[in-house]
Structures are given as C-alpha cells and as structure tokens.
Design a protein with these regions (language model features):
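Conserved short "hinge" loops at termini or chain/domain junctions
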Residues: 1-74, 88-179
Length: 179
C-alpha cells in the first residue's frame, strides 16, 4: 500500500497538517499507526477512490485546487494517526516498566486535560472524515464505487433522511450505523 506521506518530509508535513504538533515526529515510529489510519480510510472510501488520491499525491505539479483536494484525504489520516500515537507517547516504555516523561521546562497535564484533548482530537478526526465524505458524495467518480452504491441501497441512506427522526450531523456516523 502506498501512503500519502513521504518519509523524508513526514515530520514537517505532519506538523503543517495538524497545526498543533510541535515535535518532530519520526516517520518510522508512527508508520504502523499511519498504515492503520490509512487502512481505516480505505475501508470508508474504497481502494479505487484511495488510489485516485495516491495518483494525485504522486503528481509533480499540482494546482491549488488539487492540493486542497489532497488535504481532504491527508488531514483525516494524519489526525487519526496522531490519535493512535499520542496515548503511548505520554509514557516512556523502559526496561523498568512505564515511566513518566518530564523535564525542567514542562509540567505534566492532569488526567482530565488529556481526556479532553483526546476527545477534541477525536471530534476533529470525525469532522475531517465528514468533510471528505461530503466531497465524495458530490463526486461523479465516487458515485460509481461499491461503497457509494452500498450506502444508497438502504432505506435511510443520507444524513438528511436520518435527521428527519434524529439529528446526527455526520455521514461517518451514518456509515458506521449501517448494517
């Protein structure tokens, strides 16, 4: 599987995409989580749709519109990768067991702060996937995929249909609720 990130430029691109990460996150240390996040995205959008983004990613001279389109796929993958990585980065795993990472300039956040941050990151991820799905549901190429046709076969197949009875405001949630 081809990832939408290059090892050589990963740390800088990851920081720029997320905007709140100030560390140089090593590609090799997150590659398995990046792969998991990518596979999860492929499950949502399908391999042919993901492959279109790979082609766009590998393109040499992209237009501004193409860069915006690429961001729609890369941001949720990066956000999900961070959600998977962050909890294990809070602790140092040593021969003596798990240890707290500290230094003179930083203070350890309270548990409730970490939980709120994790919840906020999860909401960011869900919003990003919903934005991608909104884009895809208007895309003629996506309308030809198995993923789109599977969703359309249900009696309640859009968020508008579902929201007549219960407000969810999320295509991702609707997809997860589908049988």
């Amino acid at each position: 599987m081809i990832l939408l990130f290059k090892e050589e430029t990963f740390a800088q691109e990851f920081r720029e995409l997320l905007g709140f990460v100030d560390a140089d996150i090593n590609f090799k240390s997150v590659k398995s989580d990046l792969t998991s996040a990518t596979r999860e995205m492929i499950d949502f959008v399908g391999k042919p749709t993901y492959d279109r983004w790979v082609t766009l990613f590998e393109k040499e001279n992209r237009s501004a519109a193409e860069n915006d389109q690429l961001l729609l796929m890369r941001y949720p993958i990066a956000m999900n990768t961070y959600r998977l990585v962050a909890p294990s980065k809070d602790l140092q795993h040593t021969n003596q067991g798990r240890m707290l990472r500290t230094d003179d300039q930083q203070a350890r956040p309270f548990e409730w702060m970490i939980e709120r941050n994790n919840e906020a990151n999860e909401r960011k991820y869900y919003r990003a996937v919903d934005q991608l799905l909104d884009f895809l549901f208007d895309d003629t190429n996506f309308k030809q995929t198995i993923q789109y046709k599977t969703i359309r076969k249900y009696f309640v197949c859009t968020t508008a249909d579902f929201e007549e009875y219960f407000p969810i405001h999320s295509r991702l949630l609707l997809m997860k609720l589908s049988p």
